[in-house]
Structures are given as C-alpha cells and as structure tokens.
Amino acid sequence: MAVAVRALQEQLEKAKESLKNVDENIRKLTGRDPNDVRPIQARLLALSGPGGGRGRGSLLLRRGFSDSGGGPPAKQRDLEGAVSRLGGERRTRRESRQESDPEDDDVKKPALQSSVVATSKERTRDLIQDQNMDEKGKQRNRRIFGLLMGTLQKFKQESTVATERQKRRQEIEQKLEVQAEEERKQVENERRELFEERRAKQTELRLLEQKVELAQLQEEWNEHNAKIIKYIRTKTKPHLFYIPGRMCPATQKLIEESQRKMNALFEGRRIEFAEQINKMEARPRRQSMKEKEHQVVRNEEQKAEQEEGKVAQREEELEETGNQHNDVEVEEAGEEEEKEAGIVHSDAEKEQEEEEQKQEMEVKTEEEAEVREGEKQQDSQPEEVMDVLEMVESVKHVIAEQEVMETNQVESIEPSENETSKELEPEMEFDVEPDKECKSLSPGKENINSQEVEKESEEKEEKEEKEPEPQPEPVAQPQPPPQPLPQSQPHSQPHSQPQPVLQSQPLCQPETLPLAVLQPPPQVIQEQGNLLPERKDFPLESIKLPEVSVEPVLTVHSENKSKNKTRSRSRGRARNKTSKSRSRSSSSSSSSSSSTSSSSGSSSSSGSSSSRSSSSSSSSTSGSSSRDSSSSTSSSSESRSRSRGRGHNRDRKHRRSMDRKRRDTSGLERSHKSSKGGSSRDRKGSKDKSSRPDRKRSISESSRSGKRSSRSERDRKSDRKDKRR
C-alpha cells in the first residue's frame, strides 16, 4: 500500500505542474492570472459607484460631477411636460411682440418697391449684338470655355483614380477585417481549450487527492488491523480482542480462527478499495471523452466557418478583379451543372423508356386478346354455316313431305267443279275461326308469312324443274274414320294436347308453329307398304295444332260464303300481280285445298248429317295441319335467324342435342298414343259406324289406282280457276 500511495503522490505532483503551465498560457492570452479572484463587492463598486448598481446613485454622481467640475450646468427637467413648454414659448413670443409693437409705431419705415424688375427685350437684344460684334469678347469666351473644359477633365480623371484607390483600400480593409476575425476566433478557441484543459487538470488533481487520502486511510487501517490480528476476537458484538496469560490448545484454536476471519475481512476490504479507485478513474475518463467530442464538434464548426469566410473572400475578389480563375470556376460550375442536368435528364429518359415499355406490353396483350377473339369468331362461323345447312335440309324435307301430302290428296279424289263449289262452304266455315283468331292475336304477321310461303313455293318449283325424277316418298292417308259429333271433340283434343312442343316461344298463332311432320294413324301405316326406310327413320317432330271448336254445320249462311270468297279472290289477285311463279304456287295450294274439301264432301254425302259434320271437321284439321306445316317452316327459320344474330352458339348445340332426344321420344310416344287412340275409338264406335271407314278406304284406293292426273294438267286447271275468279 505504501507503494501505491507514493505512485499516487507522484501523479498528483505531475498534475499540479501541468496545471501551472496551463495557467501561464492563460495569463499570456488574457493578461491576468486565472487564480487571482477579485472580490465581488469591489467589482460592483467599480461598476456602479457608491449607489450600489444602476439607479439614482449614478445620476447623483453625474449631477455632482457636473456641478462641481465647473462645466456647463446640467439641464433641469421640466416636470410639467412638453405641452407646458410649448405654451410657455408661445407666451414669451406674444410678450416680445407686445413690447416691440409700440417702437415700430413711433418710427414709420418708407415703403420700397421690389428690386426685381423685368428687363426690356430691346436692351437684351442690343447686348447680344454688342457681344457678337466684339472680337475681344469672343476670345475671352473661348478662353473661359477652355478653362472650364480642362477643369472638368481633371476632375473626371481624379474621380476615376479616387474610385480605384477607394476600391483597393476597401479590399485591404476587408482582408484585414477577415484576418482580425480569424485571429480573434483563434484566440477564443485557444482560450477555451486552455480553460478546458485547466478544468480537466483540476478534476484530475481532485481525484488524485481523493485517491491519496483513501490510500492513506487504507494504510492506517491495515496498520491497525495488523496489530489486532495477534488477538482473539469474540464472536458476539461488539467484538472484543483479548489474549490469555497462558496459551492452551483451546486458545490456540481460537486465535487461528480469529486470524482466518480477519484475513478474510482484509481481503474483502482490499477488493472494495480497488473497485472504488477504478470507479473514480472511470468518471474523469467519461468526462474527458465527452469534452473531446465537444471539442471535435467545435473544431468542425470552426473549420466550416473558416471555409465559408474564405469562399466569400474569393467570390468578392473575383467579382472585383475579374481574374481568369473566375472564368475557370464558372466553367467548372457549369460543367457540374451540366453533369447534374445530364443525370436528371438520363433519369427522366429512363422513366420515359420504362413507361413506353409498359405501354407496348399493354398493346401486345390487347392485340393477343383481339386475335384470340377473332379465332373464336372464325371457329364459331363454320358452326353457324353448318347450322344454316342443317336448317335448309330440314326445310327441304318438310317441303317435300308437304308436296307429297298435297299430291296424294289430289290424286285420291276426282277434281270436279260442282263438288268443289258445293263443298267449299263447310271448309270456309271451319277456316274462318282460326283466321279470326290469328287476326286477333297477330294481324301484322300475315303479309310477312304469306310472302315467305310464296318464296318457298318458288324454290320448290325450281328444284322440281332441276330434278326430273322425284324420289318416292311416303303417301299420307286421310285421317281416321269419322265418328259421331259427341265423340269427335274429345278425340281431337287428345291429339293436340299430349304432343310435346319443342320450341320455347309462345305460340300465339298457327303460323308460328315449330317444324313438324304429320304422323299418319296406325291403320294407314299398316296399309303403306311402299315406304322407303329413309323416311321411316326420319325423326318425327310434334305439332301443336290450334284447338278449333268443331260444331255441326247444318245450315250455311250466305254472308260467310261471300266474305270467304272475296278474301280468296283478293289474295289470288295480289299473287297474280306479284309474279306468275307465285300465282302458280298459290293455285296449286288452292287446288289442293279444294281437292281436300271435295273429298270431305264426297264422304259427307254418303253419311247422315252427323257424319257430315265429323268429316268436315277432319278435313278442316287436315287443311289447317298442312297450313301449319308450311307456316312452321317460315316461323322456325325466323326464330333461328334471330337466335343466330344474338350469338348463342353454345346454347344452340345443347338445344339441338336435347331436341333430337325429345323428337325420338316424342315419335315413340305418338305412335303408342295413336295406336291407343285408334283402339279406343274402335271399341267405342258401333258396328254400323265401323263399316263406313271401310267403304271410304275402298273408294280412296280405287280412285288412287284408277285416276291419277299429271302435275301439268293440275297447274292448267288451277290457272283456269284463277282466271274465272
């Protein structure tokens, strides 16, 4: 411990010497010793005088000095204020005027005219003439003018020289000021640093002094404990130290134990002392580190200020002298600005390029999407073409079947004008009701549908001319045998109701029915032996016939006859006006209708009144079915063209598959139902009634085999009938 104390004392002496050096440096800078502390009271007295600070004491001192010094008397303050002073001045002026007025009244001054008088023009002209005439005056004027010009030039030169000198002087003064400021800053920095060093040294001295004191105390404590170790310490507190007069083994053990305990205490105390000294050393280190950081920051600030001052000086020098360095710096600055502008421009160009790339990508994606849509449309176009071809084929099949039905009906019955004139009346009776219903529901569609039917008939005739050998097609037989009136109505209704409808459109009139083919009854199917397999396999489509209320017609009204005849004549005239081909098609259709009516008339003449009504109802249903089939083709084509315009290609495919399935199922159901209906009718009918259809069948077969007329003869007859009408 003695060694540690000596080392600390040596450090303390060194610190004191360094502190003395710092004080000497401060004395050199400031001119006074920092250790000389002046008393505060003396400072205050020197500053403020006996009054003790600012206030009335200083004023009293000043007044005393002014009064005693023999100088000018001090100005006395007017306590009344400025207004009173102004008023006093006015009063003094008035008094002075009053005193001077009587003197002026006594001595009357003479009135003098003004000395400023306008000179006459004649006199000035004379003077000018005199001056021009004198040569001496001219010379004198020239001399004076020359002197004036010379003096002015001299003044000008002197002024320019003075300005240059003033500029130089200003430059020198500015430089001196800058140098003085720099020196002053340096002095301040040195002074600050010295004072900071002084403070740091003082803190170090204090710490060293504390360490020395602690070390001395530790040494004293160690010396004291070294003496105590020789004694036995009691276990109880306060501890007592004793030594027995004679040592025994028990006391020897106690001495050893007490020495162990005391040594442990000494070790603990030494460790604590060392830790405390380390802590004391760490505190000034931290403070010194903080001070160093502050110094570094201050030095940086000073350097920045100096650089700013130098830059300002350079700028001023360059502006005043106009050296080449200014141009070089300006060029460098311009190059730097150009570089920065180039960098900014390059950044902007990069951004523009990125935007352009994004736009190009978007345009490419849009073009790809358009190409895909075009491919899809092209793929859908052949599907539409296939749909159109299928429609045309289906329409051809239906038209051919209609022609076969008409030809068979015409061939089965002999065309006679008398029978047609007689039997036209019941047919027109039955046709009036559906026409009325159609007009009430859709009167605007008759003309359109009639034109479409005429166009289709023209296409038929062209195809017939191109194809000389028509294919053999199934022959449609007339409908099942007629039965009495009470049973005819319920049988006609089940035929129309159970048949499923393929199209989802609302059927308001018979012209807008779907494509359909009349299914012959089972008895007729058995008799037809010359049917082709193609026609048997053809899928049969259902028909929704308009339900016509069939009533017994025993008396025919003349009014209905005239109305129906006029309608048929007007239609025939319109068709004759359009074209000859259309008139031919219309005449063929009218002849077929007349033939059907004549067949119904022949059957009705053989039976009673009830059988007549049933046969007429069957003929009307057959006629209406033929009309429905013709109109259904046009309506189906219209509906499909509309759906094609809407672009529901996928829906069409799905519907076609579903329609084909339904047609197959509906054809089977109809065959079963027709067979069931025929069997039920046979059971319900009596033996007498069942004999009548057998007669009719024999008549129709004989007429078929014996009497067949060519199409040309039929066309001629129809033309003659149209001309007669």
Swiss-Prot record:
Cross-link entry Glycyl lysine isopeptide (Lys-Gly) (interchain with G-Cter in SUMO1), positions: K156
Gene Ontology BP term (one): cell-cell adhesion
Acidic residues bias locations: 329-339
Cited InterPro entries: Pinin, Pinin_SDK_MemA, Pinin_SDK_N
Bias kind Basic residues: ranges: 563-583, 642-660
Protein name: Pinin
Compartment(s) where it occurs, according to its Swiss-Prot or TrEMBL record: Nucleus speckle; Cell junction, Desmosome
Residue ranges of the region described as Sufficient for PSAP complex assembly: 220-283
Gene Ontology cellular-component annotations: cytoplasm; desmosome; nuclear speck; spliceosomal complex
Source organism of the structure: Mus musculus
Alphabetical UniProt keywords: Acetylation, Activator, Cell junction, Coiled coil, DNA-binding, Isopeptide bond, Methylation, mRNA processing, mRNA splicing, Nucleus, Phosphoprotein, Spliceosome, Transcription, Transcription regulation, Ubl conjugation
Subunit organization: Found in a mRNA splicing-dependent exon junction complex (EJC). Found in a complex with SR proteins. Found in a mRNP complex with RNPS1. Component of the PSAP complex consisting of RNPS1, SAP18 and PNN. Interacts with PNISR, CTBP1, CTBP2, KRT8, KRT18, KRT19, PS1D/PNO40, PPIG, RNPS1, SFRS4 and SRRM2. Identified in the spliceosome C complex.
UniProt similarity note: Belongs to the pinin family.
Function: Transcriptional activator binding to the E-box 1 core sequence of the E-cadherin promoter gene; the core-binding sequence is 5'CAGGTG-3'. Capable of reversing CTBP1-mediated transcription repression. Auxiliary component of the splicing-dependent multiprotein exon junction complex (EJC) deposited at splice junction on mRNAs. The EJC is a dynamic structure consisting of core proteins and several peripheral nuclear and cytoplasmic associated factors that join the complex only transiently either during EJC assembly or during subsequent mRNA metabolism.
